[in-house]
Amino acid sequence: MMPATLAGLALAVTVATMFAQRVDSTTIHHVSGLKGKPLLFGPSLRRTLPAGGTFKWVLVLSDPCAPKPTEICVSVGHCFYDLVSSDNDSECANKDRRVLTLALLTKSKTGELRVIGPMAASSALVGDAGELEQLRRRVSAGMGLTDDGDISFAAADKVNEGLYGVRVMGSGDSYTFFNVTVATETAGDDRDLATVRHVDIAHNIVPSEDRDHVFVSMPRMHVAWPHGTTVLHPKMIIAAASWRPEYNFTYEWYAVPYDGYCATMRLFEACLYHPSAPACLDPAGHRGCVVGTMTHDDLVGRVLMARCRGSDLRTCEPHVIHIKQKPMVSLGRAVPELRVESAAHIPSLYILVVKIDDSVAGWAYTELMAEGSSPRVVIDIHMPRPTSAQGGIAALREIENDDSAPSLGSNEGGGPGNSKRRAAVLGAAVWIALTLLILGGLGAYVAVNKKCLRDKRQWLRGSRKPTLETHAHTYTSLPVGGDLSLEQDAEDEDEDEEELLYERERRRSSSGSKKSSRSPSRRSSRRNSFGPTLSANALSRFDKTVKLAMAEVAGRLLANKTFPSQRY
């Protein structure tokens, strides 16, 4: 047995006891110590590791892109610590994590741990192997391993700080991490290891037995049968909280077609928990290569499982809420099985989401592909970049369905597809503005014309005057001025009689001239009989009367300022 203090053993037991309280995420423990004092941490895997089992210790190198322990809350009262990578996606998106392997151990048949050495390199390592070896020696200086497989430092130093991880090889379990910090010892501090070394767990993590646990898994890839039915059969285990005698949950199937040009299919896990986030509604990148918030068009089926008791899903009462007819899909007998007919074999990413109380409790995905290559699915734990500066242009989502070329494997918003999409948005805005301008101009023109016509009609009604017929063939009466006396009226009557006699004689004489050859004596006698009655004075008065009448008519016309109409 390697040398260890009694306090170290007691703390190792404390750490082992602490591991009985686990969370459904990457387990992270916070370890702090004093500079120059002994430090011990680890899960004591020798006690639980079967014979022949192997596990390894790693150190996540300090880097701007390295993941950092962060408290994450998925619901009220359900918070845990997990590793969160840097938000600087532009620099860290395609950068591998620098992980340094410290030790690789195996358990023999006799129950002892044997160090089979740190590996010279790992597939996850980036950098020169010689540089990494020097770094390993510097970090492991003063580091030892206990019989239980824990890490110990005889005198902790600042160089020993970092994020240490341990994982059992081949078990499928995730890493258990220890976030180690070393504080500087103050003067007069004589605290021992038992009081200095401690493990802090977030106080608001709900114990595992007091909340729901959902486990969902299925193969990452399915090859579609050309002339048959493809069955998607995930494994789902639900362990409800102890205070739930009965519970309801829903499971939803989504099918997101992917573009054949995509080198990778990027699925943003954060959008499953925050579907209304603006960046998830309109993530940057080509629509066929990026999955943010899944829409109703992507929904294939939704089933409500009511009045479930315990973990036996056969006690639930299924209620199909939604099932899509195209593509041809149907629910299988087992929950949550999905059957996809051959007619619906479109290369797609099928996603299963399980919700309890409208909160996402678990999810899984698989690729349904035809024979041949398929894009590599990348699960991104970050929030996506929004297409616009404000993000979430939900009203223009239909414009994304253009025929623009995809941005292959890109997580940025400046690819060819986004440039064409922005050009389409700008063109649509210009056309809308021009249409509104033209319609507004036409409306103003019609309104002005209507007003002008209305004003003109009112002016014509108010200024219309009666017209005089000055071009008739015969006057029926002549206007007489108001200054004429009664005596003149009597004289006018006499003159009128004389004028009538004169007019008759003139007509007879004009007609008789044509017959002068037949009756010359008769025409001569008539002229002699009427001649003495028409004196020169009568002719003078008649001429004066005609002139007065004409002057009166002209005066009235000028006074009224009315232009007579002409009728023929």
Swiss-Prot record:
The keyword Ribonucleoprotein does not apply. Belongs to the alphaherpesvirinae glycoprotein E family. Phosphorylated on serines within the acidic cluster. Phosphorylation determines whether endocytosed viral gE traffics to the trans-Golgi network or recycles to the cell membrane. Keywords: Disulfide bond, Glycoprotein, Host cell junction, Host cell membrane, Host endosome, Host Golgi apparatus, Host membrane, Membrane, Signal, Transmembrane, Transmembrane helix, Viral envelope protein, Viral penetration into host cytoplasm, Virion, Virus endocytosis by host, Virus entry into host cell. Residues 482-497 are annotated as: Acidic. Residues 21-422 are virion surface. The gene is US8. It comes from the Viruses. Residues 515-526 have a biased composition (Basic residues). One of its GO terms (cellular component) is viral envelope. A motif (Internalization motif) lies at residues 465-468. Residues 444-568 are intravirion. In epithelial cells, the heterodimer gE/gI is required for the cell-to-cell spread of the virus, by sorting nascent virions to cell junctions. Once the virus reaches the cell junctions, virus particles can spread to adjacent cells extremely rapidly through interactions with cellular receptors that accumulate at these junctions. Implicated in basolateral spread in polarized cells. In neuronal cells, gE/gI is essential for the anterograde spread of the infection throughout the host nervous system. This is Envelope glycoprotein E. Its main location: virion. Disulfide bonds join 271-280. SUPFAM superfamilies: Immunoglobulin (SSF48726). It comes from Psittacid herpesvirus 1 (isolate Amazon parrot/-/97-0001/1997). GO terms for biological process: endocytosis involved in viral entry into host cell.
